[in-house]
Amino acid sequence: MMKTGDEADLSVDAALRAKTCKNHSATHLLQKALREVLGTHVEQAGSYQDGERTRFDFSHFAAMTPEELEKVEKIVNDKIAEAIPVRTDVMTVDEAKKTGAMALFGEKYGETVRVVSMGDFSKEFCGGTHVKNTSEIAAFKIISENGVAAGVRRIEALTGDNVFAYYRNLEKELLEAAKAAKATPATLTEKIEHMQAEIKALTSENESLKSKAAKEALGDVMDQID
């Protein structure tokens, strides 16, 4: 139990901070990518980052299509590959607005604000921790998109080593599924389609036999009545 006057050492978890930085900076790229793909009606409705993932809530009226998600993901990864320097500047609110920096809707700001810029692609009011260059994010992968309230969607995504771990896990599951189906990853889809066709044929044959048996049973009953 600590008491007044006790000394303590304070240190930053560098590894956790680095992962959180990647997720936070990726979220800035994500918001701009969403506005490019879906429209400028997209605004932040909530945001959370830790060392594992980023979670971003935004205004939108419908579930995103697979094609839209793919476009957004590609834009973010393209900006990561461009190795854009991440710059921070402190300026007055009026100066920040003149730069075109995005502010959080409904948020009240003081006389000065911090603006985080990623080239000409993304500029936002932000006081959080970030990478120094988008290349540090390494990779970006959307893992889910769903609704959380009327007119509000949520995206969860991974960055860096967590993306590679995600794909390694998918590969492991694919190999296990292929083994169970006595196929290879390359032939798994074909094998599943073949199995589905067999099941459909057997189901149809079973229904036909049941119908035939029912008719025969009915015939026996009618014979007994006669």
Protein language model features and the residues they cover:
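Active-site palm subdomain of RNA-directed nucleic acid polymerases
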Residues: 33-46
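Short pre-active-site segment immediately N-terminal to the catalytic Zn-binding motif
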Residues: 14-24
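Histidine-centered catalytic micro-motifs
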Residues: 22-35, 125-133
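Short, conserved phosphate-binding/catalytic loop or strand-edge motifs used
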Residues: 48-55
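Terminal appendage regions of diverse proteins
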Residues: 41, 51, 134-226
